Amino acid sequence: VTDDLEARVRRLEDRAQISEQVIRYAMGVDRRDWTMFGDCFTDPVYADFSAGGMPAATVSRDDLVGRISTALNGFTATQHISPNHVIEFDPGDPDRAVCYSYMFAQHLLRGSGNGEYYLLRGSYTNHMLRTPGGWKIERIIQHRSWEYGNKTAVAEAIEQSQAATLS
């Protein structure tokens, strides 16, 4: 019974850590805490945001942080909500799991002539790996269900972010 109880407790701890890492991803983005955001990933990481125009690729963690920060730093504010986590552990490898989660991303771009709001709904498939530093996202795939509002907001925010970097 003790071994079984220990295994069950460890599985619950793993679930909590995986879920927290996915939430920290969203919090890091919204706080513009790129260290927190980057710490969510392995290095390298496979990132597939092709539904939003960023081609799927295996990149360094720093490259992913650079791409995402450039895309989002130009927004006035964002709020990324990641609910409904379903975690499936690899039956052949206790150090691997997949976390499926919903995504609700709100973006505010004050002063845009094309509309200040851009809303995005969808989901993520996060392939997780247990590392010496805890559970990390090894592969992230974004799936978009629908979007509403200023669909040029991301491109506008990138322009603003790049202009701010140059000045």
Q: What name fits each language-model region?
A:
Residues V1-M27, R31, T35-D43:
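Short, low-complexity N-terminal intrinsically disordered segments enriched in polar/charged residues
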Residues T2-E6, N73-S167:
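A beta-strand edge to alpha-helix "cap/lid" segment located at domain peripheries
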Residues E13, A56-V59, E116:
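A structural signal for alpha-helical segments
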